[in-house]
């Protein structure tokens, strides 16, 4: 314990030396984060670390009113949807400039979307466009009508399309001129229309943004916004206490009393639209989505690199679910700042199936299921453990240790596999894991955000998978597809409830917890509004 405290002190002292004077300057805000960004291209990322930075650099056609999931205009001033739901015309905001001084217009919108779906586009080669394929494959094309009007033509009606256009991932508008200048390195030099402009990125240390004085919404109150990487939450809190940073994410729940009793700090907390899970690689994915963002019917299912025969068996996956005491994890690791999960969507979302009974913590039944599956003595398996804290999982190593202990009790020996964050994501998207810790924070407020990204077989393409269990139940895919063909919420809810029933039976995930959002700020920081989707918008923030 003494050595751990000493290392935390050393880390904090190093931080103070490296950033001395930054926090004391007027209008400079330093936010402590658990990990670095992977890329700064909204079309080509799936991680929240990257998105936290880009929330302040880029903008979408539509967005949410602060603190809600109520849709409002953003770079689009208005829009019209055809009666059959297959065409959407957006009327764009005029007088908006990119950070490089070029105009935001219809050409920029067509470019930002076209590079993701048009394989003949010269910029298509620079990305994997994973979330386009997962959520936006219904878009056939985006066409320019005039300089400030664009039309989205859909292949099929999609009830979630407008909410999907709020999520920053895949749909934020980038500067075509900047993309042409930097080509495959554009993700290192982001250029949007947002309230802050990119200045520098020192890998694994910090990203600096500065106020966009020509921002169409008015200049931000902050002069500079710095995202400082401090992986250890105790070190982040110490840095906040001594004034080297003004805000931080993912505090240790055990430090809440310390935070609440410090008059120089304030804790912001709200329910999280998230799920933390352990994905069990069921063994089969497919090579790539077609131009519609879906798997062709004749595309074969092939073994993933992490194929492991025991995990392909339903009874084994059910046994794993029964061997893990999730309530203990919530009580002792989340320390009551989360609720135990039994389904893959939060309880307040459309279609949540509360009638499902969670797998009980039952070691004897788990052992019996393993024996029935042909593994009475268990087996050895690897678990990928995230190197960073997330909104849905505050302390992945501790959760991994708990799972390791629980599964050992039924004869399953778990070996940890740890990588840097960027490599971790690449390997689980490629299906190299046997089991992995991950999760999702909803970006759109729509249940489809969870269903199409996490649970749909169409999202199990090896190399870009967001369905990290590589779960390939075709009935589930059909139900998710049907849910997007109607605007009737009751009908959509029934489809989602059925999906949850099927997934519960097949058990490709261990759903662990729905965590609260927890952020800590200096008491001198004002007007930060927690987003239900965990977005990090610092535009309105000011410091006394």
Set out the residue ranges of the language-model regions.
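N-terminal lobe/hinge region of extracytoplasmic solute-binding protein
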Residues: 32-83, 114, 191-192
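Bacterial N-terminal signal peptides
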Residues: 9-18
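Active-site-proximal polar cores
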Residues: 512
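Mature extracytoplasmic/periplasmic domains
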Residues: 176-177, 336-356, 518-523
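Extracytoplasmic/periplasmic ligand-capture domains
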Residues: 21-24, 64-67, 86, 93-123, ...
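Long beta-strand-rich cores associated with HINT superfamily self-processing modules
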Residues: 519-544
């Amino acid at each position: 314990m003494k050595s751990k405290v000493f290392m935390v002190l050393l880390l904090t002292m190093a931080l103070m030396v490296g950033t001395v004077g930054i926090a004391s300057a007027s209008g400079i805000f330093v936010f402590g984060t658990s990990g670095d960004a992977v890329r700064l291209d909204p079309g080509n990322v799936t991680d929240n670390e990257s998105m936290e930075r880009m929330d302040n650099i880029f903008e979408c056609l539509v967005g949410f009113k602060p603190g809600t999931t109520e849709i409002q205009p953003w770079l689009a001033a208005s829009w019209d949807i055809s009666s059959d739901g297959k065409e959407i015309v957006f009327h764009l905001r005029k007088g908006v400039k990119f950070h490089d001084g070029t105009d935001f217009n219809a050409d920029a919108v067509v470019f930002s979307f076209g590079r993701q779906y048009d394989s003949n586009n010269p910029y298509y080669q620079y990305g994997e466009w994973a979330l386009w394929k997962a959520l936006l494959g219904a878009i056939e094309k985006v066409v320019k009508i005039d300089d400030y009007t664009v039309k989205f033509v859909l292949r099929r009606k999609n009830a979630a399309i407008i909410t999907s256009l709020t999520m920053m991932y895949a749909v934020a508008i980038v500067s075509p001129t900047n993309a042409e200048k930097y080509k495959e390195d554009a993700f290192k030099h982001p250029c949007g229309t947002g309230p802050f402009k990119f200045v520098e990125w020192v890998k694994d240390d910090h990203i600096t943004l500065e106020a966009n004085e020509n921002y169409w919404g008015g200049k931000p109150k902050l002069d500079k916004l710095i995202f400082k990487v401090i992986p250890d939450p105790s070190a982040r809190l110490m840095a906040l206490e001594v004034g080297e940073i003004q805000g931080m994410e993912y505090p240790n729940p055990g430090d809440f009393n310390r935070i609440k009793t410090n008059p120089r700090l304030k804790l912001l907390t709200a329910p999280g639209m998230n799920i933390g899970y352990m994905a069990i690689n069921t063994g089969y994915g497919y090579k790539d989505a077609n131009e519609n963002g879906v798997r062709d019917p004749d595309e074969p299912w092939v073994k993933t690199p992490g194929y492991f025969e025991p995990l392909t068996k339903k009874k084994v996956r059910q046994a794993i679910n029964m061997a893990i005491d999730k309530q203990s994890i919530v009580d002792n690791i989340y320390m009551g700042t989360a609720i135990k999960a039994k389904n893959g969507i939060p309880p307040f979302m459309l279609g949540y199936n509360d009638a499902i009974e969670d797998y009980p913590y039952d070691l004897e039944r788990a052992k019996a299921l393993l024996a029935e599956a042909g593994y009475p003595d268990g087996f050895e398996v690897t678990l990928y453990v995230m190197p960073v804290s997330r909104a849905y999982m505050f302390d992945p190593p501790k959760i991994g240790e708990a799972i390791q202990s629980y599964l050992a009790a039924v004869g399953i020996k778990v070996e940890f596999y740890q990588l840097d964050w960027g490599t971790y994501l690449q390997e689980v998207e490629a299906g190299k894991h046997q089991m992995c810790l991950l999760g999702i924070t909803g970006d759109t407020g729509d249940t489809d955000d969870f269903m199409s990204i996490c649970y749909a077989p169409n999202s199990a393409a090896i190399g870009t998978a967001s369905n990290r269990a590589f779960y390939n139940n075709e009935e589930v895919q059909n139900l998710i597809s049907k849910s997007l063909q109607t605007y009737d919420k009751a009908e959509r809810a029934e489809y989602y409830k059925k999906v949850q029933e099927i997934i519960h039976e097949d058990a490709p995930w261990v759903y662990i917890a729905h965590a609260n959002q927890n952020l800590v700020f200096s008491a001198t920081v004002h007007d930060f509004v927690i987003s239900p989707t965990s977005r990090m918008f610092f535009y309105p923030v000011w410091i006394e």
